[in-house]
């Protein structure tokens, strides 16, 4: 405000990610032009998305939330590791918090790049949702039923019993099979229907899931399996 003049800048509510802009003001006294500028930063909502959606974003300051399975750890103490979900894999670079291989984690960070490859930058470990144990299909079938213990299974889909709820049989290279009663991609369990069909998952595809061991009519099975990896047959 100067000599009775006032400039008012109003920003609309930000329902997206963080955003920044620069407002340039120009005035004149009739002889000389004066310019000033003001940088404005507005925090936004943290945007939840899949790994594939994150990888497709541009480098910037928007904060994203991803949930994935830790598939490789370069340096746990330094927060350098890979996470994957059913859509793909991404590198997490120097995130706060410490993780272990086969943890299911939720990460918040920005889309950064290194030599053109997307990665999670300025990351923060929001939550270790669960820790799972990798196991062979044979050992899984022989394991005791336990609703509190999580396993990581990998196998090729050999039969889709129900594509609406994701009831499938998977098989390993030794011919061992496991029945999965329900496969979906949402760790929260809110979206359990049509995961198989919506994502074009078919017989012959290899999937990696995190699941508990249960039984039905004395037959072993995995239940409520969350998919953290898909390798297409073709």
Q: Where do the model's predicted regions map?
A:
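A short beta-strand micro-motif common to beta-rich folds, especially ectodomain repeats
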Residues: 7, 17-30
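OB-fold single-stranded nucleic acid-binding module
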Residues: 43-234
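Generic structural detector for well-ordered beta-strands
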Residues: 8-10, 24, 39-41, 156
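Surface-exposed binding patches on compact interaction domains or structured appendages
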Residues: 1-8
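Hydrophobic loop/turn residues within beta-sheet-rich immunoglobulin-like superfamily modules
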Residues: 12-14, 201
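C-terminal edge beta-strand
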Residues: 32-44
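Death-fold interaction domains
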Residues: 20, 35-37, 215
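Beta-strand-rich extracellular modules
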Residues: 12, 24-30, 110-112, 212-214
């Amino acid at each position: 405000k100067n000599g009775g003049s006032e400039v008012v800048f109003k920003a609309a509510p930000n329902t997206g990610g963080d955003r920044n802009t620069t407002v340039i003001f120009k005035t004149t006294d009739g002889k000389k032009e004066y310019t000033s500028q003001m940088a404005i930063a507005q925090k936004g909502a943290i945007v939840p998305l899949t790994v594939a959606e994150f990888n497709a974003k541009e480098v910037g300051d928007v904060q994203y939330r991803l949930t994935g399975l830790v598939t490789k750890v370069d340096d746990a103490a330094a927060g350098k590791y890979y996470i994957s979900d059913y859509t793909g894999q991404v590198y997490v670079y120097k995130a706060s918090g410490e993780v272990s291989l086969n943890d299911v984690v939720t990460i918040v960070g920005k889309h950064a790049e290194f030599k053109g490859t997307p990665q999670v930058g300025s990351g923060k470990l929001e939550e270790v949702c669960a820790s799972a144990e990798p196991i062979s299909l044979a050992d899984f079938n022989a394991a005791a039923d336990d609703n509190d213990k999580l396993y990581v299974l990998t196998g090729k889909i050999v039969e889709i019993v129900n594509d609406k709820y994701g009831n499938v049989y998977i098989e390993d290279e030794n011919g061992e099979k496991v029945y999965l009663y329900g496969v979906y991609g949402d760790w929260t369990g809110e979206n359990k229907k049509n995961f198989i069909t919506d994502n074009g998952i078919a017989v012959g595809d290899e999937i990696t899931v995190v699941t508990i061991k249960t039984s039905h009519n004395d037959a072993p099975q995995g239940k409520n399996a969350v998919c953290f990896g898909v390798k297409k047959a073709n």
